[in-house]
Amino acid sequence: WWFSKTAVPSRMCRFNWQNEAKERSLSKLANAYLEYLDKGGQLLPEDIDKKMLDRFAAVEETVHIAYIKPINYPSVYLLAPERTIDTSLYGRSDVTSTRRTDLGEIMTDTTVNNAFLRPNEEYSVDFYGRNAAYSSGYIESGLCNMSAEDFYELLIDMINCGLSDDSYSTVFAFLREYNNEFSDLPSSFAGFEQYDISEEMRTLSASITEGLTYDYEKAEAIEAFFNDGSFSYDLGYRAPTDKDTPEFFVNESRRGTCSDFATAFCLLAKAAGLNVHYVEGFNSGEIQTVGVYNISTENAHAFPEVYIAGAGWTIYEPTVSGNS
């Protein structure tokens, strides 16, 4: 279980905690659409408009709730699972609301500069679980016969029209889910940084994946490359300034932190033609009671995710075990 920090996008279905649950209607999206119309948004064609409202008034999905407490670090973000629809921060007069950022984080919107979440401050997060009807009906089959492009534009328009916090969070969650289901987005799509891959890394990637056909085979081969016994995890190691590159890591030092392993994996995977992204986050931390998690800096980690057709964004672990 991971709280995604910097991935764009990040797979949402891996959060399936058996915590306190409650029902919340997906008509929240329909309500957000009505608010969008009230603010001057463009009305959809009548048949689509009616289907949209009827559909989401009738579909419900279980919402899970978790209570989270960062125990030894301050933060300007409220760490949260993907598909978060609501957060509640207790006892903070300087926090007026919360907003999703373009990285899927929950960020405090404050009335003072540099406000941050202090250690041991607890907050709650409500988020959707994975529901097949919601996922396939909304994404794979399309919404009310709208094209993917039209629906994407609608979500963007709704976000940009100045929705209330509740509607904004709802629409942003749907936009994130939409983005997750499309693995062939152009390189110019917002949020995807493109990196030059050296010929040295391309040659190594080709040798690792030679003779392999399927994406999952290539991803597993690249993961196995780091687990051949020659790499070591060393939290205190620092490469020479003039050699702090992925090429030096895989070919010479073979020592580093999770960031080094994840970065090298991503470059090798991208060179092999895989759809991959680098993720930093925090695992679920120490469970205090049912639904309550304490998260410390020791729970931080970096890892890659590869999009595997039929399975979605899949976590791989190139980082080898270490003494730290």
Language model regions located:
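Helix-boundary/low-complexity linker signature
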Residues: W1-S324
